[in-house]
Amino acid sequence: MYDSIIDPTLGPAADSERGPMVLAGRPENLSGLRLGLLANTKRNAEQFLDEVGKLLVDQHGVTAVLARKKPDITNTAPEPILDDLRAGCDIVVVGVGDCGSCSASAVADGIILEQSDIPAAVVCTDAFTASADAMARVRGVPGYPYLAVPHPMANLTPEGVRDKATAAVPGIVAMLTGRAMAAAS
């Protein structure tokens, strides 16, 4: 009667044929690299990423920053935005996942960039790790690493955003350079 049952939580059928995804290679440090910032439309996402960008320039020698904003929180970044990041960046910080939909799409964006051999550090708040983890599984990358910061982000004052960015930078650097992945192994 039926040929097969499709379980959408397992991801595309091709995933089992492709094998596990390999993350992009990681640099030893960020000095001289071009940084991409991919923000969604959540309140404080751009401000958080701008603060992260300033800190990475000042403290880690990033030489250029290319900021892009997605038109919505529920979908992955459109190809023209991804093309800009692929062409102009060596590393990308994606965020901020501060709700279920935007956490899932942030992880999907990170995986897409990794598939283009661009190291990505995805930032989500800790209240939405279930959504982020589910998207990683659907995309065929269970256990995809991302940085979970304390929730919430959207209602923070400018000072609170700066403080959260300052606290997040060591984890972002560890993710971009591979130190976080090595520690998890």
Give, region by region, the residue ranges found by the protein language model.
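N-terminal amphipathic/basic leader segments beginning at the initiator methionine
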Residues: 1-24
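Structural motif
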Residues: 72-83, 161-162
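Active-site-proximal loop->helix
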Residues: 107, 111, 115, 130-141
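Glycine-rich phosphate/diphosphate-binding loop of Rossmann-like nucleotide-binding domains
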Residues: 28, 33, 37-54, 63
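Short, well-structured alpha-helical segments in soluble
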Residues: 79-90, 109
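A charged, well-structured terminal subsegment
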Residues: 149-184
